[in-house]
Amino acid sequence: MILPSILLLVAHTLEANVECGVRPLYDSRIQYSRIIEGQEAELGEFPWQVSIQESDHHFCGGSILSEWWILTVAHCFYAQELSPTDLRVRVGTNDLTTSPVELEVTTIIRHKGFKRLNMDNDIALLLLAKPLTFNELTVPICLPLWPAPPSWHECWVAGWGVTNSTDKESMSTDLMKVPMRIIEWEECLQMFPSLTTNMLCASYGNESYDACQGDSGGPLVCTTDPGSRWYQVGIISWGKSCGKKGFPGIYTVLAKYTLWIEKIAQTEGKPLDFRGQSSSNKKKNRQNNQLSKSPALNCPQSWLLPCLLSFALLRALSNWK
């Protein structure tokens, strides 16, 4: 358990000004019961979760990366006739029937390598018309840790999608959540021969927990320790029906696309770094660039733990000065 703790210390040092992946309003943990077979999420439990809507109808989920950017999947925008001006993004709420905070979209950017046949490269970005205002109910999610931890302590998905796999009209107006466990890629390949290395699988043992229609684009979020930051590991993409026992859901592996996200954000003039931090402040940009070039981040595998310890100590001393 030492390595994940060190990783979190480094992440916290790097992201002290970002406050991504935190849940300021959600201060208690409740046990899940038995969106398929889900439980209603608590207010502020997933403050990075957004509803993507057309004509006031929810059709896909997404997550907040920064004040300008929403992350989702490409297949939600496969219909060429869908215009950015038709979209609204609702933030800061679990209940879609309440008076919403809605934001307009100026640009839809699908990954050019998206393949509808096998759902490879199923990722997209939405550029907002105006920047988000962060608060207790509106918080960006952290992008994946580097290096990846050996295991995640806890993972969840949430959404407003179908809650009954036999009734496609059973869309929820309340945000529902289900626990998830990431499955070994080789094991999942046996069930899904079309699986690519840009995909991961997640389920919860033999339970029928799953995402479904309307949940696509929502985040799979994980944490390494209780009470620590949350990181988006995957994006809800596809699966074999909904909640079918023995068949996990398929998610886009977010770690494969951090460079793509950064490039798109820079091209559009609204850059962010790998952790979802806005880079409008040039001073912070320079600091992040220096950190990215630090020798401690290029250590041999055998020296990883000592390097991370040294790096965290140096950063703490630097901040103290």
Swiss-Prot record:
Keywords on record: Cell membrane, Cytoplasmic vesicle, Disulfide bond, Glycoprotein, GPI-anchor, Hydrolase, Lipoprotein, Membrane, Protease, Serine protease, Signal
Disulfide bond positions: 60-76, 155-222, 188-201, 212-242
Gene inactivation effect: Deficient male display infertility with impaired sperm migration from uterus into oviduct and defective sperm-zona and sperm-egg recognition/binding. However, the mating activity, sperm production, sperm morphology, sperm motility, inducibility of AR, activity of acrosomal enzymes and in vitro sperm fertility are almost normal. Male show an absence of mature ADAM3 in sperm.
Single GO BP term: proteolysis
An annotated Gene Ontology molecular function: serine-type endopeptidase activity
Propeptide residues according to the Swiss-Prot or TrEMBL record: 295-321
Major enzyme class: hydrolase
Domain Peptidase S1 per the UniProt entry, residue ranges: 35-266
Active-site residues, record numbering mapped to chain: 75, 122, 216
Region of interest: Disordered: 272-293
Its job: Probable serine protease, which plays a crucial role in the fertility of male mice including sperm migration and sperm-egg interaction.
The family this protein is said to belong to: Belongs to the peptidase S1 family.
Official protein name in the record: Serine protease 55
Protein source organism: Mus musculus (Mouse)
Gene coding for it: Prss55
